[in-house]
Every structure is written in C-alpha cells, then in structure tokens.
Amino acid sequence: MSRWVRVALVAVVAAGLVSLPACGNNNSGKIKIAVVTNCTDPFWDLCEAGAKKAAQENDVELLFRQPERMAAEVQKPVIDAWVSQGVSGIAVSVIDPKGQTEDLTIVAKKVPLVTMDNDAPDSGRICYVGVDNKEAGRAVGRLVKKILPNGGTIALFIGSTTSANGQARPAGVLEELATPEANGTRAKHPLRPELEGKYYGKYFLVDGESKTDDGLKERAVTNARDMLNRVDGVPDLCFVGLYAYNPPAILEAVRARSLVGKVKIVGFDENPETLKSITSGDIEGTVVQDPYNYGYKSVEILAAEVRGDHSKRLKGSAAYQVITKDGGPDQDINGLRIKFPKAVDYERTVRDQLKSVGK
C-alpha cells in the first residue's frame, strides 16, 4: 500500500471516528470539549474517567479518543475534524512537540487548547496539565539507587524519545544517578566487554540510551526479552520502564525467563498490572502521575475558558507520587509535597476510578 493511500485511509477513519458522539447527544446544544490521547492504554481509561466526571459537573458534552497507534499523523486528522465540526475546546497529549507545534499553533488560534501529560509549550496552548517529567524521572532514579545502593547495570525502556516526556523522564533518571566523575562516561561493561554503554555514577546504562518501542506493546516485550538475552548472567540488574505499559511488558519477559526477583523492575505510571505486581513483590515500585485528574482538570479548564472564566488555568506542575509495597511518609521534595502510598491502597483508588467508566 502506498504512503498516500495509507494517509488517506487514516484521514477517512479518523473522520468517521470523530463523527460519533463519545457521550451525550451531539444535537444537545451543549458546549463540546474534545480530548485526544497519544495511544490506547489503561492510563488513558483513568483520564477518561476524570474527563467524564468533569463533563457532568460542568454541563458539557465530551468527545474522548484513544488512538490505536502512537503517531502524530494519526492524531492530526482527529484534531482537524474536531476543529471543522466546531468543538469549543481541545485537550491533547502531544506525541511530537517539535513536529506538531506548527499545527497545534493553528488549532490554538481557533479554539482553546490544553496540553496534558505531554507538552508543546510553544503552541499557544492555555496551560499544561501534568507533572514535571524530569523531576518525576529523578524520583525513578532514587528508587533505582535504593534498590541497588552499590551500583549495577540498568536498561531504560520507553515508547518514544521524541515526545517531551520521552526526553525528560530518562534525563531525570540519569541526572539522579550521575556523579561529577561519571555523567555519561562511555565504557565497556566490566564483566561483558561486548556490551557498550555509559556510566552514570555507579550505574552502567546498556547502550547508553533508552530502548524505544513506538508505543507498540508487543515490541516493548520484545525489547525487554532481547535485553535479557544480552545481559544474561550479569548481576545487579535493574530494568526501568518509563511508559505505562513498559513495566508489565518487562515483567512478562522476566517471568518467561524465571528471573523474577533477580532482575529488579522499576516503573512509571499506574498500570493496574504494575500496581498488583508491586504488592506481590515482583516490581519494586513506580512513580505515578494522576491521569484521572488530568482528564478532570483539562475539561474543567476548557469549559471555564469557553464561558470566559480564566481562573482555572494551572500555573505550575502537578505533584507525582511514589508507589511501593510498604509506602512511606509524605516528603517535601523540590517545592512539591510528594506522597508515598502503599501499592494496595493506590490500586484500590485506581480500581474505583476505572469502575466509573465501566473498565
């Protein structure tokens, strides 16, 4: 199939999707607020739950889409169709800020625009709803240091390194691990010289960069499986999954090799499987955002904007949370009050949120 045919098909499918109501009646005369995510994932089911709650409370009609593929060219026709249909406001998790800023700037001149989870700061958006991903990445780095205090070998896994969070999260992890003497120092692995990478403090990063999967969960499992083959026999291993589906994908590969407990796993986001696995001890911990609140706040802000109320705009980053099996007391870290809930308690919260959208 030619590239032009594929693009045309994407546009046709997207146009068909956006013509269907996500909730409510398209002829109701209500304000229409549209939300598009960067892919399909339980993380975004939580976002949808929050968005629906805000839509009810603010008396607006909600259009909510989770694209099947993490690609800007899939997202664009959905947004364009919404603009053409006259929606009142749009929230988007930006996939490629550099590549999408020009198009989003045009959108922002026509309707109020909010970015969430992933930012495009030069797009003219009203505000960003999300955590400081570099700070959240540093929290992941602190988990790694707690698990492997004497150093070790690490591998990072993520969907994309073109998105804002795909760049900031790994950067935060590595900044936390680095020392003045070893901040990306190129080296060969001391036990496996065929493995090249970089040292960040006492931690050897295999290949010196994150392994990406383009949002494809099957590829995420394959990446983890391939890495296990390459580091076979290396002690003090920690695999870090930085998108919501990465920790379960890593765990699937680790279980297949009967290496649970031998390969430590640290995650990002609140995938239900990740939370269950922290409670069971198969995953060490995860740093979570608040996708429910992302959806809620995005809709609340846009509904207020349409009605001339600018007071709901957010001026700073949201606080992340650190989830472990045993939890811990709240801490003040870099100006944010950070909570450390037990996995079993946080899982209950997530389960209740998902029930509200029938998941």
Feature roles, as predicted:
Residues 1-9:
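Bacterial N-terminal signal peptides that target proteins for export
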Residues 3, 23-359:
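A residue-level marker of the well-folded mature domains of exported/periplasmic proteins
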Residues 12-15:
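Repetitive helical segments and hydrophobic/amphipathic motifs
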Residues 18-22:
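C-terminal motif of bacterial Sec signal peptides marking the signal peptidase cleavage site
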